A protein has these predicted regions:
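C-terminal "lid/loop" region of Rossmann-like NAD(P)-dependent oxidoreductases
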Residues: 54, 81-84, 92-99, 106-123, ...
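Generic alpha-helical structural context detector
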Residues: 36, 40-44, 69-73, 99, ...
Length: 157
């Protein structure tokens, strides 16, 4: 890619995204990620609500509208061939995610954490310092706003 960039004088933005979520996400429980899975399951009135793994597993979730904003900023103002992490830069525990979804869906089931099930890397949050300092990026949405908008979108399908 770098060679092509030099040959054609093409500006190439390199983006390393975190865990995006939002409207038009994949909500198929067999193949989707944790955010749409929790939204869909909460809306199906599961009670008790069994969640695999630990509530302490932490991820850098990012609402898709902010992800797009970050990607466009890299393309418009970023240095060609320089990688930028596009994320929120903030860790959200799976337990916090669950309670944000419960709040957005207005559900209150009994929660059971099943620690015997597989889990993943305990902490995965990207530094977005370069994106903030060099390109002036700031997310427009809070995590909770993104969850609420995504939930409302899914409910209105």
């Amino acid at each position: 890619i770098e060679h092509t960039s030099h040959l054609t004088d093409m500006h190439i933005g390199i983006v390393r995204g975190t865990a995006p979520f939002g409207p038009y996400d994949n909500f198929d429980l067999k193949t989707c990620h944790v955010v749409p899975a929790l939204i869909k399951r909460c809306l199906s009135d599961e009670d008790p609500f069994v969640v695999w793994g630990s509530p302490d597993v932490t991820r850098d979730f990012m609402y898709v509208k902010d992800m797009i904003k970050g990607c466009l900023l890299v393309l418009e103002k970023g240095e060609s061939m320089k990688p930028y992490n596009v994320g929120s830069g903030t860790g959200v525990e799976i337990g916090e995610l669950l309670f944000a979804v419960l709040n957005a869906t207005e559900k209150n089931p009994l929660i059971k954490w099943d620690n015997s099930k597989p889990t993943t890397i305990p902490y995965k949050v990207s530094s977005i310092e370069r994106l903030e300092k060099e390109l002036g990026f700031k997310p427009d949405y809070t995590f909770e706003q993104g969850i609420k908008e995504t939930t409302e979108w899914y409910e209105n399908l």
